[in-house]
Amino acid sequence: GKTIAALYPAVEYALQHGLRVFFVTAKTTQQTLAASTLQQLAQPGAGVSAVHLRAKEKSCLNDFYYCHESVCEYAQDYAGKVERAQLIEQLLDLPLVSPAVCADMGQRHRICPFELSLDVALEADVIVGDYNYVFDPGSYLRRFFQDTSYDDCILIIDEAHNLYARGRDYYSPVLHQSRVRQLLVQCANEPTRLFHEFADFFQVLDGFFPLLHDSTLTPVQPGTFTPVTPPLEGFAALREQLETLMVDYAIYRRRTGPLSSHDPLQDFYYA
């Protein structure tokens, strides 16, 4: 009852005033419930278009998840394929564009389902998705929130008490030295040159930990805090190196096939 009680008046007001509604949740089950509610509201002729965004990784049709045009056929000529098939127009005729619908279109037309859902969202009246798409500085929807003015939006935060912990995690990245050293050893023991390049990368990354440790040794009085400034330029350079290595690794994985259900390098990259 609370979902439709929040959505119905918001959608009605948005349609009357040319606004877009974002309904964000912390749980997939709540997103599914909201999408189901919208499907009932957005019957043919109601004049409402809605899209349910699934996580990018879960939407991927490849065995190995790495978004780069050089290794993903679903990203290659994406715009051309969408335009030639007039997919956006087709999808906007539906009351609700679900992840399953986008996946089906992606398979049939060899295009990225996630990008398709984002393009549909540009024209939709209601968007349902995770907190990430609004609040995560690393994955928020820049096409909607790049500007500082949000006068054209209505934001509904489902179970907002969950947002505190999520927000804290968004702005508190974690890097474990034990994990870095574990990957260093694993890569160094592989015979392939590419893995040795990864080992060199992890060796350099491991060298940053003493710098971070030394910067936290300043005595702090109870009730006060001390800022810790990581070597941002060094991390930025390593990030560029990792991007290059991951492209090569994605090509390698396409050639050799999946190694396991949970790839350690892939998990590290997206952590």
Predicted regions and their residues:
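Short helix/loop capping segments that flank catalytic or ligand/cofactor-binding pockets
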Residues: 32-33, 61-62, 136-138, 143-145, ...
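Short basic/glycine-enriched coil/helix segment immediately N-terminal to the Walker B
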Residues: 115-127, 140-153
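Walker A/P-loop
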Residues: 1-9
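Conserved Walker B
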Residues: 124, 131-133, 159-163, 167
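A substrate-engagement module of RecA-like helicase motors
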Residues: 15-127, 131-135, 189, 203, ...
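Conserved phosphoryl-transfer catalytic core
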Residues: 160-161, 165-232, 236
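Alpha-helical scaffold elements adjacent to nucleotide-binding pockets in ATP/GTP-utilizing enzyme cores
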Residues: 9-10, 33-41, 52, 137, ...
